[in-house]
Each structure stands twice: as structure tokens, then as C-alpha cells.
Amino acid sequence: MEESSAAKIQLLKEFKFEKILKDDTKSKIITLYGKIRNEVALLLLEKTAFDLNTIKLDQLATFLQDTKLVENNDVFHWFLSTNFQDCSTLPSVKSTLIWPASETHVRKYSSQKKRMVCETPEMYLKVTKPFIETQRGPQIQWVENILTHKAEAERIVVEDPDPLNGFIVIPDLKWDRQTMSALNLMAIVHATDIASIRDLKYKHIPLLENIRNKVLTEVPKQFSVDKNQLKMFVHYLPSYYHLHVHILHVDHETGDGSAVGRAILLDDVIDRLRNSPDGLENVNITFNIGEQHFLFQPLTNMNA
């Protein structure tokens, strides 16, 4: 394990920066484009949240170092400081390396404007569904690894092994597992024939209700959170095409991740299925899409 870990850390050291893809000052994440061993790599650097269990608030003079005054006005004083850092207890940066990175990864993590699209059933069948088929199989091997316990097995929070109505809940790697207001989990279904909400039909209501009920029961047992502090939703378009449900703390600030035009509440999906027994393949769905997305041009052309 140590040798494997050292080899992965070495990859980070071999990253050769070429350009900045995105600088998000709100989320404090910068996305860098570069190469590792002549293959495209993306490196996401994120400022970590303060761990109030580690910082000794009664010893701030030790925590805040090299402090300088920026400005003061009446009762207000602004300072800049470096802070004491320790990788085990007080890391300051979380890094995510994607290597080798595909063109899909590059497009996804690039800075881009978004547009609203109303996708009709015809547009879905002619444009979106064929695209989704290209994003299955090897493109989501990492999902298969989780479902078969080949990877991240020690991170599983909840599991129901039933092949039809079962799922696995794991923490999203964006969450530090310490800041409860930033709680971020993901329920991945065992069923392999549901790529997105477009594949959902009336018969899938027991699956969705099972996710909702077990999450609301089990997650509060493991984390300091009440069930009415959890919000569950799906994305359309999703970031990968194997049905999964996002589970976040209600106070979580997620940018556009849980915003109108991207997220659909799980309870709303269940209600829509009750009212549309034939499924969600035959309804209009309006969502936002980035201009770098492979589907942007064909969908907007049909929407014109």
C-alpha cells in the first residue's frame, strides 16, 4: 500500500503545468491543464475548510503566522496571515488529479458560459441517447469498481445489495468528512440499465423510495445530522451516466450543483413517475448546459 501511495504521489510531482482551465474564486478551486508522461492531466487545487476540532482557538497566535495589517478604519481591521500547516491535521490544499484525462474531462472542467435548453423526447432520442451510449462501459469503469468492492470499499456508508432496488452510499471525494454543513454523499444504484432519469419508469419507484428511506434512516446514525437536514436530488444532465443520487446537507453551498436547471429533487422525480407511468423518456426536460459540452451545439441547434 505504501509503495502504491508513493507511486501516486510521484505522479503529482511529475505534473507539468501548461495553462489554467478555470479559476473559481467562490469555491476557491483552480483547475490546471498539463501533462504527465506526455499524456493530458488535470489538477484541481482546492483550499480546505477550517477543521474546528483541530484548531486551538485559544492559541490563535500560534495558528496565525506572519501576520500583516492590510487596512483599518474605525473599528474594522483587515489582516493577511499564513497559517500553521500539518498534512495530517491541518492540510491547506486538497488536490484532485485526473490522469490520463479525456477530452470530456477537459471540456467539463473548463471555464464556460451556460445556456438553457428544453430537451424534447425527440431531441433525447435523436441526440442525447446516442451520446449517452458512448459514455457507458469503460467510461464509467470506476463506478463498476465501487459496486463490486474493487475500490473504495472502506468508504461505504450504506449498502443494500439487492440487484434491483439496492445501492451503495459513499462520501463524495469533495467532502472532507469533518465539516457537517458541507456533507456530500452519493448513492449509486446496483441496477446497470439506468443511465439517467430518462430511463426511469413507474416500476423504479420502489428503488427510489428505498434510497430515500434508507438514507434518511442510516445517515443520521453515522453523522451528526438530522434527517430533515438532508436534501436528495439527481442531475440532468448528470456528470456520468449511471444513475446516482446526490445527498447533501441542506446548508451546503454547491454553486450550480443543486441549482434550478441542473438538480431535480428526488421526491419530485418520484411524484413525476407516479403521474407519468410510461416514464420520463416521453416528457420535456429543461436544463442548463455548458457551451463546451459535446451536446451543446446539436441540442441548441434543434432548440432554435
From Swiss-Prot:
Q: Name one GO biological process term.
A: deadenylation-dependent decapping of nuclear-transcribed mRNA
Name the domain of life.
Eukaryota
One GO molecular-function annotation for this sequence? 5'-(N(7)-methyl 5'-triphosphoguanosine)-[mRNA] diphosphatase activity
Q: Motif Histidine triad motif: which residue numbers? A: 242-246
One cellular component term (GO) for this entry is: cytosol
The catalytic site is made up of H244
The name on file for this protein is m7GpppX diphosphatase
Protein's organism: Schizosaccharomyces pombe (strain 972 / ATCC 24843)
Q: What is the lineage of its organism?
A: Eukaryota, Fungi, Dikarya, Ascomycota, Taphrinomycotina
Gene giving rise to this polypeptide: nhm1
